Amino acid sequence: MIRATTLIAICTLVACGGSEPAKDGAPSKTDRVVLQNKGSDTLVNVAQAWAEAYKEVNPNVAVAVTGGGSGTGIASLLNGTVDIANASRKIKDKEVAQAKKNGVEPVEHVVGHDALAVFLHKDNPLKEITVAQLKDIYAEGGKADKWSDLGIKMPGCSSDEIVRVSRQNNSGTYAYFKEAVIGKGGEYKLGSRDLHGSKDVVDLVEKTPCAIGYSGLAYANEHVMMPCVKADDAAACVAPSAEGAIDGSYPIARPLMMYTPGQPKGATKEYLDWILSDVGQCIIGDKGYAPIRTVKCGA
């Protein structure tokens, strides 16, 4: 089901293949098809939920979902080994150039939005943080290496050292945080604990009093604390939420994408249309992300 052309296009809800989702959510009958879907760890849980629910919609289509990171998914798309790549960051210019060499046209489909939350140990007294302070913590040349640099006395953290928990560099979350917080031309400080998965970040912060980490809001739990985030010193402090991701009030929110190799057709198009339908968008909302529009879901 892999197609090949040569330019990049952006696809909106109605423009994803040129028609709206079927009102009854039922795709046309086809022979047995397996769609390969790979990429973002942020999206993997909701992608698995979509795949499971879609079995009831069309038993003739199976969706094989794997993670590995946004970069891994996009690389697989460009190599022609997946039908859909999941990404929590935009495709890079160099990836587009490689796509052209491979005769592939990556088409972007925004399937939801995510608030990138900051996670702290539950005993951390820090209730709010600015984007500039996050940069001081994570960026090369940043001035915050100890909690006392932020005016914080951290219980259980005798060293006072800020333990920076981050993601591996094939992660879309890593790339988005670098773009939104560290800024153009900046680099991460050396010495962070770079983990494979979103849940891994939250789990380590939960167990480490000195730690700070970042991950998708959907991975939050009652054992960690999330400070509100201020765009600058004068801005309102906004807690991470699906609503803040939708209206743009939360400073570090991002779109979540699926990429296809060319305009989707057949079973791929029917599946994406269903994801963008109210049923599919209610599923992403139920998983802690923000849908692309207001949808009415069951009680």
Regions found by a protein language model. Give the residues of each.
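Exported/periplasmic ABC-transporter solute-binding proteins
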Residues: 16-114, 119-299
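Sec-dependent bacterial lipoprotein signal peptides
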Residues: 1-14
